[in-house]
């Protein structure tokens, strides 16, 4: 039996186990320290902000015009202050949703907030706001990128490199990232 199977947060069932035996095993599961730490966060903010905030649609399709994204006064640290005062211990930010619009200064595409906001890095502002408010930072990064599909990069291996480059940027340029969400 390997170490993972012996861990107190793992239950291993034998195919011959009865329901009663399975219930008895499951009743003795203990969460790992990392799992306990995550559960103690209890209240986490999930911020979904993108060009579609201004289009009144839930999802974009990757063909949005840069002119669709027009925040009059973007105050990302204010988001963090409000969430912190509400008792949230972490914020998860949609750095890129399915439309492919990147909310950080990326080298992978010009379909980003950087090209529209004159170099302002929304992700950097969020990271600083979370740090200033003693909150954890989570990143939502959609592997499904409808904007790149339109450019012919969809099922090709090049897309994997493109996506991994984005993930690398987010995990190395913004300090500690406590959680990563993939969706798509």
Describe each region flagged by the PLM:
Residues 1-184:
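Mature catalytic domains of secreted/periplasmic carbohydrate-active enzymes
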């Amino acid at each position: 039996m390997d170490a993972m199977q012996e861990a107190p947060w793992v239950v291993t069932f034998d195919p011959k186990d009865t329901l009663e035996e399975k219930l008895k095993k499951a009743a003795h599961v203990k969460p790992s320290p990392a799992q306990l730490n995550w559960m103690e966060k209890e209240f986490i903010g999930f911020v979904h902000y993108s060009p579609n905030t201004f289009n009144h649609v839930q999802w974009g399709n990757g063909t949005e015009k840069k002119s669709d994204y027009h925040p009059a006064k973007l105050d990302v640290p204010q988001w963090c202050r409000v969430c912190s005062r509400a008792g949230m211990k972490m914020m998860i930010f949609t750095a890129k949703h399915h439309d492919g619009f990147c909310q950080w200064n990326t080298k992978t595409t010009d379909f980003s907030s950087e090209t529209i906001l004159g170099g302002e890095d929304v992700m950097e502002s969020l990271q600083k706001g979370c740090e200033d408010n003693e909150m954890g930072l989570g990143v939502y990064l959609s592997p499904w990128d409808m904007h790149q599909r339109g450019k012919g990069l969809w099922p090709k291996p090049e897309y994997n490199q493109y996506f991994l480059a984005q993930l690398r940027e987010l995990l190395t340029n913004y300090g500690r990232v406590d959680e990563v969400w993939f969706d798509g």
